[in-house]
Amino acid sequence: MAQFIDRRLNGKNKSAVNRQRFLKRHKEQIKESVADAVNRRSITNTETGEDVSIPHKDINEPIFHQGKGGVRERVHPGNDQFITGDKIERPKGGGQGSGSGEGNASPDGEGQDEFVFQISKDEYLDILFEDLELPNLEKNQIAKITEWKTHRAGFQTAGIPSNISVIRSLQQSLARRTAMTAGKKRLLKELEDELTRIKNIEPAQQLEENRLKKEIEELRKKIENVPFIDTFDLRFKNYEKRPVPSSQAVMFCLMDVSGSMDQATKDIAKRFYVLLYLFLTRTYENVDVVFIRHHTQAKEVDEHEFFYSQETGGTIVSSALKLMDEIVKERYPVGQWNIYAAQASDGDNWADDSPRCRDLLVNKLLPNCQYYSYIEITRRSHQTLWHEYEKLTDEFPNFAMKNIRSVEDIFPVFRELFQKETA
């Protein structure tokens, strides 16, 4: 069996390369596990990583081995009991079952525990928000958001095998062999010329001829011993993240805190907004976030008050939409900003106010918004607000609405709303 020895030097995190390779290879299984973990842990808990489990059958790695077919007899290293031709007895079972354990617990089947390992906080958030983006983000006059894109950045002497540059490595090999053998080849040529000259001299100088032959042989061995390629020659493609010009963006978070929103419904809304806030701050370096709470009256608040205030009251949803329109006109010129909004409510609204909300969206907000999402948190049948908003879905492609029934729906709905568009 062929054996491969990795002689490359690593830093203090000597397994970092292997870890990244493992995460890349089992990306889909890890994403599924992280998506399940979102519902188990508090979304605000981002100070720690996450334990990820992968079925044992999914982590089998490719190995180098002899091909199938043919007849081979082999004695494996470490064997001190058998010789070629011996047949090994079948192991005696420990019970009635065909499983891998002992005893009579199961009549059939076998299995292995899932492979469990921990990913770091950064890895957890990277996987959580992968393939998500703010829809329809356009470049405006003033760029403030910093997005990052991976670019080729020359070569480096360490890396993973998939990034190796064969041509550059062979160029380095040729340069090294030329540098290490040029002087020896020059001396070899001189000795060979000297040997030819001595052979043509009469009388023959046998001792000098033997000395030259010995030196020539030693030089040839030294030249042959220079390896064709060495780890010193290996060059790997280097990649780095560079900021790319992007645009200014503002996200309006509109949350219903009226009396009809019970504590469980408010908690779901807050979890959704925490997830949205983490996504924005993790993916984009500079995004303005405007928090608006509303019952019969709407008020712009800071982050702490948005998530922790206990204020409540009746329900007039249009008050929040009016306040958002005022803030846009005052602070966020449409020509310079990408405007986004995420509205969460239980759908309970004063009946005469729901048509007013639709008119505000049609005439004021949607023409100026890159994307507007409405999330209704309820297990009941939809009310007038949902039905009024439903009329907008065909007319405005930048408007989306989803229903969240329980905590388990938060992350799937979030991914649907902010899924990256495929080119």
Swiss-Prot record:
Belongs to the UPF0229 family. Residues 93-102 have a biased composition (Gly residues). It comes from the Bacteria. InterPro entries: UPF0229. PANTHER family: UPF0229 PROTEIN YEAH. Residues 69-112 are annotated as: Disordered. This is UPF0229 protein VP0986. Disulfide bonds: none annotated.
